[in-house]
Amino acid sequence: MRTAISILVWLGAGWLALESLPANASADPATELTRCAELELRVAGLLRVGTALLYLDQCSDAKRILEPVPKKFSLELARPFRGQDLVATARSTLKQNLALRDDEDLPAPLRCMADAYVDADSGDRYDVVFRPDNGLSMYLNGELLEQCDASSGAEKYFMIWFGEQPFHRRMRDRLLEQALNHSGPASS
């Protein structure tokens, strides 16, 4: 069951429901970035699987989400996920967006980050952070899992969620729309 849920969520099953959360919902207090968007993720509109959050320096940077601007994508889990399922889906989604055939063709920083996923339980939180001067970092519950170099193209890891072929198009669109319409002060 856990594997099926992971695959459905990460591959973007057509019936994954997205619900906006109120602006005062909790966010990571340690971030220097502004929480610009937050969506609850549900399978079939019933089963809550988690919450997706987007952080940017300025919410208007959502227009440049795939450019080398500071950003963070967080996933708060409401269900357990197997790391190997997330690794496989991250690699597959990146290859689709970059028009690559083999895992070995993925640029090193993207492969490094895709391989960082580990098994996680309900209540855990993944944070993927890109800073132009520091590269990519992945955290689980605030603990660093992996840091990958800042070589050219590392920001493209965010294609998983925001590329032309994201794992879920409606989630991408709703997060970006929320960020561009964000008018309140930074949430923390």
Where are the model-predicted features located?
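Terminal leader/tail segments of proteins
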Residues: 21-188
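Positively charged n-region of N-terminal signal peptides that target proteins for export
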Residues: 1-4
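Bacterial N-terminal signal peptides
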Residues: 6-19
